Amino acid sequence: SSAASDVYKRQEEYNGKKFGDTQDPLLVSVRSGARASMPGMMDTILNLGLNDVAVEGFAVKTGNPRFAYDSYRRFIQMFSDVVMEVPKSYFEKIIDEVKADKGVVYDTELTADDLKELIVRFKAVYKEAMKGEEFPQDPKVQLMEAVKAVFRSWDNPRAIVYRRMNDIPGDWGTAVNVQTMVFGNKGDTSGTGVAFTRNPSTGAKGIYGEYLINAQGEDVVAGVRTPQPITQLEKDLPECYSQFMELAMKLENHYKDMQDMEFTIEEGKLYFLQTRNGKRTAQAAIQIACDLVDEGMITPREAVMRIEAKSLDQLLHPMFDTDALKAGEVIGEALPASPGAAAGKVVFTAEEAKELGKGGKGERVILVRLETSPEDIEGMHASQGILTVRGGMTSHAAVVARGMGTCCVSGCGAISIDEEAKQFTLGGYTFTEGDYISLDGSTGKIYKGDIKTVEATVSGNFGRIMAWADEYRKLGVRTNADTPADTKNAVRLGAEGIGLCRTEHMFFGEDRIPKFRRMILSDTVEKRVEALKPIGEFQKADFKAMYEALEGRPMTVRYLDPPLHEFVPTEEEDIKKLAE
């Protein structure tokens, strides 16, 4: 409490403004500052300090009443959602009703008077949800409650899931940053954006990002509007662009890593809101690490330490078969937000993805959403790929998908989606739940049907990183392999031998399992010896091929481990067939 009061005083002194002032009120944002970056997982509150009186002073100061009332409307909505847990959907519904009444399509078409009406209705929703308590007018109370809420959001379900997936300790806790507000929605010389100093999908050097003119930061990240590429800023606001490029390079040289930066331009003046080391795909991580070594910024040892070992798994993910891809029918194209090839059944909710996909029934699913929100994280994790109608390359879906190594195509405005009826139309076709589509996250192309994928190959920079890793590592690495093909692959990827060969896996092939079952079902010793002969032959051939592939490297063989009932069928039809 005393820390929050201290912040309150310091902000007023530093800015030379007062909270709740009737002429020029001080407004702040309250956001988290955890030790590890967790994009979209924790809560932020903007425009704090507005109340029924301050909003009028703000309208006078900015000379833009529409903007002032829109800021207040957003604050009530965010404060209610984050601090008091009044669901967002209540407010979205009211906005849709008012837009329908006024006969407009976009939020931006609502007038100052329309927004005043929204504010009255929003405060009524707050009062009802809070059992008669009015929306707080004292900025001190607003600040205290907001700070407490951001601390609490460390333990919200999506943040817990994200930490579990990324091995971030729960006891680290978070900090809360209180920043003076700057506004990107003050007209055509204002804007807001997110940019990376290198491409987070491929690692290519050069500014990569997006911005929206006349918008607040939340609009870019939430994926509600699809933004402009950063290069367009050079045409719109050339001075800001050159200053931005200079500062972006300065930040990268200081942190010696690719930066993910949020910025706002307020009436032609550029502000950086935050910078952090950017989330990237494994492919980009390798490219960036090698480039930074070549540019003399880091050493090879640092390059190896920068790459998360488990992320390298992404590079061995499948790609589309070239011939199958040529034959495939392209039904749409959008933004290539996270690379990779994905084909699977269409699902429309994160819950269905979780139930059917990885960790559930194990089917291949593609999650199709209007836009994803942080609550969808588990469903995104269970999907082969993600397709969104709204949002850009820096939207929540794109950032989280890249971090997970999941293929993602975003901002496909050509899709007409009906989430209730569980169907969407694209390229003249209608797709319902369970239909197959394929996504190419490297090109942004969307294909009809289930396109065949093939194993990936190891590229040049991957080899460089692995060679550096070999130089510095102390451990020897062997692999699990049960077939000659797996063994060849393991040797190709640098394994020093086979740590475990599980012999039972040799029997699961379609042509082999019947022979093994015949041995299990033999009712005399003679029949069993007879049935073992073909098994011995294919096992001998497998071992021979594996030893040849190993070229003298060691192999540990485990004899039959599972109980025999695991080799017999469980489906009614297969049992019948076996009995016959």
Segments (PLM) and residue ranges:
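Solvent-exposed beta-strand/loop surfaces of large extracellular or lumenal domains
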Residues: 409-420
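C-terminal domain-closing interface element
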Residues: 273-275, 432-480, 486
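Protease-associated
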Residues: 297-383, 445-446, 450-451, 462, ...
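Residues forming the flavin
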Residues: 404-406
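Active-site glycine-rich loop that binds ribose-phosphate moieties when present
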Residues: 423
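Nucleotide/phosphate-binding sheet-loop regions of phosphoryl- and nucleotidyl-transfer enzymes
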Residues: 1-328, 363-366, 373-378, 384, ...
